[in-house]
Amino acid sequence: MSENEVVGSPTTNGDKNEDGYPAENGEGTNVDDNNNEEEKDGIPLDNDNDENDSSEESATDEEAERQVREGFIVEDEEDEVPQEIRRKKKRKKHAESTADQDMLDEEDLELVMENTGQGSRFSKLRRLKRGRDQEETLENIFSEEEEEEENEVDDEAPNRTQGHRAGVIDEFADFIEQDEFEDEERQEEKYETGPPIESVRPEALGISDDDYIQIYEVFGDGTDYAFALEDEDAEDELEESVSLKTIFEPSELKDKMLTEEDEIIRITDEPERMQLYMKRNIDCSEDEFREQVAWIIDYLLKNRRDIDAELYEPFQTAVRYVVHFFIRDSLEVPFIWQHRRDYIVHNNRERNTITPLLSQNDLWNIFFLCTKFWSLHSKKQDILKLYSDLGINDDLVVPFCEAASSLDAIDDLNDYIHFTYSEQIRDRALLMGTGLRRPQGSKYSFFEKFRKSSLYNLVKEFGMSAKDFSFNVAQGARLRFVEDNTLSPEELSRTYVTNELSSPEQVLQKARRVLAEEIIHDPQFRKSFRDKLYNAGVVTVLATQKGVRKIGSEHPYYEFKYLKRKPLGSFELEPILFLKMLKAEEEGLIQLSIEFEDPDDVFKGLLELFVSDNFSENAMQWNAQRELVLKEVFKRFSALAPDAIRETLRSRYLDELGMRCRNQLFSRLDQAPYEPSTKNFDRGTIPSVLAVSNGKGESSDAIICVFVDDVGEPTDSLKLADLRDLANQAMFAEFVEKVKPDVIGVSGMSVSAHKIRQHVQDSLTSHEPVDLIMVNDEVARLYQNSTRAVDEFPTLPTISCYCVALARYVQNPLFEYAAMGRDLMSLSFDPWQHLLPPDVLWKYLETALVDISSLVGIDINEAVTNKYEANILPYIAGLGPRKADYVLKKIAATGGRIDNRSDLISKQIMSRKVFINCSSFFIIPNDEYPNMDILDSTRIHNEDYELARKMASDALELDEEDIEELETNRGVVYHLLEENETGKLDELVLEEYADQLEREFHQKKRNTLEKIRLELKDPYGEQRNVFHKLTPSEIFLMLTGENPEELQADAIVPVNVRRVTNRFVAVKLDCGIDGNIKADEVSDDFIPPPQLLQVGQTVEGVIISLDEANFMVDLSLRNSVLQSANSKRQTSSHRTSYWDTEAEKRDTERMQAETQAEQRVARVIKHPLFKDLNASQAEAYLSKMQVGDLVIRPSSKGSDHIVVTWKVAEGSYQHIDVLELEKENEFTIGQKLLVKGRFEKMTYQYSDLDELIVLHIKAIAKKIDEMCIHDKFRKGTQAETEKWLESYSEANPKRSCYAFCFDHQHPGYFILCFKASVNSPVTAWPVKVIPNAFFLQGNVYGDMTALCNGFKLLYAARTKNFRRM
């Protein structure tokens, strides 16, 4: 079935609402309206007004907890607790001990409250202190003592963290014996603290309200003595019961979908996938809805170039309808595709044509775009709220925010507000009570101070503000003009000279800096600059030192290793290439740069919008100042803009990669059961299958034959040693005659499987014809060793389970793929799918399962008892793994079956919205049950049942009396089908009927009417594509693992010699296929093959031709052919017009020189740690050794150098160059060994190798160990450390933070990452480990304490200097 297939013409169902959208939400069903109401959680009323009532106590507890959170604790509140309650609480101590196990302890609760932004519970209870200065000393900015000081608590203050729940502990409590009514009191407390008992209505008892009240006053509510009727064993069970949280780890609860969030998803009346993947606002305003539609349309049109101009308006209307279905009606993609198709096609009545507007892929794109929009929208609302709270008036903020269409633009606006109004934001934070004192200065303190000073007037005298210039850039024209000052820049700046700024140039420098910063933070400028860079940008790749060595000509990254100035826009056609480049950059193999193709031209264009047209000397001087400002802006933002572009492209291209994987899986799922050519089966009939395989194809492997019947169960099997034996062939033929399969499927895990196929065919030459096919075994390979196979067939051997999976794949590919669940991600859908995060990949794969599962439908009653069929239930529209499990359990609890679809509502198995989405995909066969509805066995939705009955009665030309009579006897539709009168449906003129429905009821139903006709003629007929038979290329790839395209002519491959004769040489390739080399292709000198080759030898050969079907290849070993193939590969490999040939040549020559240097006479040094290895070999040698181990090896720099390579950490090795002085000769070790520290500009001298090892290597290793055990060290990468700092800073906005991590690019170095405030960026300083010390910013520190303190002092000093500027 094609994804874009559209059956019939456009139509619709349901009246339009006030907004012009169809009110099609299932209200035409044959379900009782009373049963369509959503269940509401009732709140039972308890008439017991006793002061000790547990509900009152619970309310008190909740109030106490709320007060704890808010910090408003009354000192003497505990003294007001009645004495009776205290006594009861002492009695409850034993009962509460079990409940307390589920509660967080003090430290955990403290951490949770801090991380959720509620602050410490104890922070409000600290003793009063002297007021601090408004600005703390900079030395304390990263102080660890601050936290301890802030968490001090009055020693005499009672611990009130538990509120009333803690109670008062009697000092003599341990000495008081429990009285004999302890059990009774526990029972009393059980009823007090347990769930409220639902009240009984008087009318249900047949008495009046007054009588009920009188009875209640005399006898109570019946719970006072209920404990006496309680079974003690049951009570013990209750006391011993524990929550799931005490049984399972949180990760296990999440995997088993038993968390509270899972339960919410399970019971909420919304499709499960919408709750998981779609962030939306059902109650959004019409303005918000229109904004969302416009944003999605704009996004889609940027990527759709196949829409004609005349279809733009219908396309936009179709998108508007789809968004409405998602947001307002909670309809999933399969429902829209099946039952709202009329809204996503264009019906041209004049031309009588129907044009599809949206495909299933488009529907899923819109589905995910809804989430992206609401993420954008929520950020917009946050910005507008901040703007409103600040009480400022800025004509840029609101218009820019409303027009922003990307998260980048919103981030730009956020940066602009925090830069421009940083002081107001800090004042707002103070007023909101987020801190005890005025927050310290931010990174914008200098600009705040500058804007308040008179010097800011000089910035205004530049003649054009940052806003005006950015407006010109955004418009691409000079619409706002410069006004030159009558004084020259130097003359005007003299008036601002002070003691700190002693010259006009210093004054101008400060003014230029401020103006440049204002331009850089202007969101209009940022957006326009990024747009220019995207449209006129080029990409250049520079291989790192690691990349030069690692990326060889056969490496998958070589295609872009020397890429130079490739237009950025060209990657729209090669999105995967860009993703591969980003991945290579993450691995440290390349550096990716995005820059303007002609930066000078772009700069001139921007400058034209910023300068004056006047030609006076004064104007020229001011223009020169403006040019200096723009140079700084251009330089700074040229470095910042590429990051946003690459992340935007990464997100977009990952979506495209996800869609590629989805489409691949969709095509594999879209296969009907195999249709045997020798049988007259209806489409969709399940065949019986005989699966044959020899497993891995090794000589010891037997041939296994497993027969699987048409219900998917293995019923017979046969094991043969060798099918080449005629006796075994006869046994196989007898077995086939016995089980009589509809089709025989062969597969295996080696090339020998294709020979098994030939042997099977030979065995059946005298047998009546049976289809013989090769079967895709990608599912079977995973199934054979899975826990699912063990659970289903615990006694079957692995290879037999493999055969069962092969047979089932032939019977129904969908069921086999669906049964895999998330293991589907182990299959290959795209060579680069590993670039997708697992959750994102699964999200896209799931969409394919949902589409095909909903197309095929599910026999819901069969699914209750058949787990194999139930595997597709989670992928039915409206459901998911949680709701599917819930539905099966509810059906099992209500008799194990449902008689009709309406039972899903009437028996409260599912709620209304879920029912609307999934009901038509539930098949209920037309069995002989009185409550059966024959339409429940079709794809017709309940809302269209009346239309189906109307069409059936019109086809049979029945009057009302006839219809009434037939409806009392199974109905009109049943009569139409039983009497085989469905041919009369073709006589109906559906177009006229559809026009009438649209004209009178505003319902588009043309496609729906056609679908009803098809379903009445063939209920739930097979609509998938025919079973896909593997092509020779696909069989070749499956059995060899090699793509045939990679084994074409001129490919160079290693081959192993198996047989040598004077006429030919038989070889085998690594992939398992056989090769043949003619005698004249062995050498150019026509030397007989036996004189050159011997069995077992491995040589390089050139492929001449490949026979895919027979798994044979012809090769040549001639030197001339090898040289020609090498030359072709080098000239054609990855060459493009954007290739840096000079860099490639330079690196090649350097690598060759290093190779030659390594191949010189090997140097031998008498030392146990010396090895004759190169750099990569040394790393490989140390990879299996302990951290700190080392080797001494020769150096490529000459005989007066050696290299010490040592293992810094797992995967990290430092190569230390050692210069030898005072050598006796070329081969002896020098008497002086020097290690030059370039970074710290120090030279270390040693007398021999052992001294160097102990005093240098081991001393460094000891310091690295000291760093790694420090509490400020983090094991992750720099990016992970920075992310952690960001998260920590958000959770602790009043604190500065820092951490150390490995510098993976420079072994032997660490990176000090720090974040001074929540609004400041993360800054990184390099820290080098030197013998017995750490080196930071030109200073040497002996230990970690000194390093941390030194860092704080350095930062404080720099900040002070920065403020003076």
From Swiss-Prot:
<feature type="domain" description="S1 motif">
    <location>
        <begin position="1050"/>
        <end position="1118"/>
    </location>
</feature>
<dbReference type="GO" id="GO:0034728">
    <property type="term" value="P:nucleosome organization"/>
</dbReference>
<dbReference type="InterPro" id="IPR035018">
    <property type="entry name" value="Spt6_SH2_C"/>
</dbReference>
<feature type="region of interest" description="Disordered">
    <location>
        <begin position="1124"/>
        <end position="1146"/>
    </location>
</feature>
<comment type="function">
    <text>Histone H3-H4 chaperone that plays a role in maintenance of chromatin structure during RNA polymerase II transcription elongation thereby repressing transcription initiation from cryptic promoters. Mediates the reassembly of nucleosomes onto the promoters of at least a selected set of genes during repression; the nucleosome reassembly is essential for transcriptional repression.</text>
</comment>
<dbReference type="Pfam" id="PF14633">
    <property type="entry name" value="SH2_2"/>
</dbReference>
<dbReference type="InterPro" id="IPR055179">
    <property type="entry name" value="Tex-like_central_region"/>
</dbReference>
<keyword id="KW-0158">Chromosome</keyword>
<dbReference type="InterPro" id="IPR023323">
    <property type="entry name" value="Tex-like_dom_sf"/>
</dbReference>
<dbReference type="Pfam" id="PF22706">
    <property type="entry name" value="Tex_central_region"/>
</dbReference>
<keyword id="KW-0539">Nucleus</keyword>
<dbReference type="InterPro" id="IPR003029">
    <property type="entry name" value="S1_domain"/>
</dbReference>
<dbReference type="InterPro" id="IPR012337">
    <property type="entry name" value="RNaseH-like_sf"/>
</dbReference>
<dbReference type="InterPro" id="IPR028088">
    <property type="entry name" value="Spt6_HTH_DNA-bd_dom"/>
</dbReference>
<feature type="domain" description="SH2">
    <location>
        <begin position="1167"/>
        <end position="1262"/>
    </location>
</feature>
<dbReference type="InterPro" id="IPR028231">
    <property type="entry name" value="Spt6_YqgF"/>
</dbReference>
<dbReference type="Pfam" id="PF14641">
    <property type="entry name" value="HTH_44"/>
</dbReference>
<dbReference type="GO" id="GO:0006366">
    <property type="term" value="P:transcription by RNA polymerase II"/>
</dbReference>
<dbReference type="GO" id="GO:0008023">
    <property type="term" value="C:transcription elongation factor complex"/>
</dbReference>
<keyword id="KW-0727">SH2 domain</keyword>
<keyword id="KW-0804">Transcription</keyword>
<feature type="region of interest" description="Disordered">
    <location>
        <begin position="181"/>
        <end position="202"/>
    </location>
</feature>
<dbReference type="InterPro" id="IPR006641">
    <property type="entry name" value="YqgF/RNaseH-like_dom"/>
</dbReference>
<feature type="modified residue" description="Phosphoserine">
    <location>
        <position position="143"/>
    </location>
</feature>
<dbReference type="InterPro" id="IPR023319">
    <property type="entry name" value="Tex-like_HTH_dom_sf"/>
</dbReference>
<protein>
    <recommendedName>
        <fullName>Transcription elongation factor spt6</fullName>
    </recommendedName>
</protein>
<dbReference type="Pfam" id="PF21710">
    <property type="entry name" value="Spt6_S1"/>
</dbReference>
<dbReference type="GO" id="GO:0140673">
    <property type="term" value="P:transcription elongation-coupled chromatin remodeling"/>
</dbReference>
<dbReference type="Pfam" id="PF14639">
    <property type="entry name" value="YqgF"/>
</dbReference>
<feature type="compositionally biased region" description="Polar residues">
    <location>
        <begin position="1"/>
        <end position="14"/>
    </location>
</feature>
<feature type="modified residue" description="Phosphothreonine">
    <location>
        <position position="137"/>
    </location>
</feature>
<feature type="compositionally biased region" description="Polar residues">
    <location>
        <begin position="1124"/>
        <end position="1139"/>
    </location>
</feature>
<dbReference type="InterPro" id="IPR049540">
    <property type="entry name" value="Spt6-like_S1"/>
</dbReference>
<feature type="modified residue" description="Phosphoserine">
    <location>
        <position position="454"/>
    </location>
</feature>
<dbReference type="InterPro" id="IPR010994">
    <property type="entry name" value="RuvA_2-like"/>
</dbReference>
<feature type="compositionally biased region" description="Acidic residues">
    <location>
        <begin position="47"/>
        <end position="64"/>
    </location>
</feature>
<dbReference type="InterPro" id="IPR017072">
    <property type="entry name" value="TF_Spt6"/>
</dbReference>
<dbReference type="InterPro" id="IPR036860">
    <property type="entry name" value="SH2_dom_sf"/>
</dbReference>
<dbReference type="GO" id="GO:0031491">
    <property type="term" value="F:nucleosome binding"/>
</dbReference>
<feature type="compositionally biased region" description="Acidic residues">
    <location>
        <begin position="73"/>
        <end position="82"/>
    </location>
</feature>
<dbReference type="InterPro" id="IPR042066">
    <property type="entry name" value="Spt6_death-like"/>
</dbReference>
<dbReference type="GO" id="GO:0000510">
    <property type="term" value="F:H3-H4 histone complex chaperone activity"/>
</dbReference>
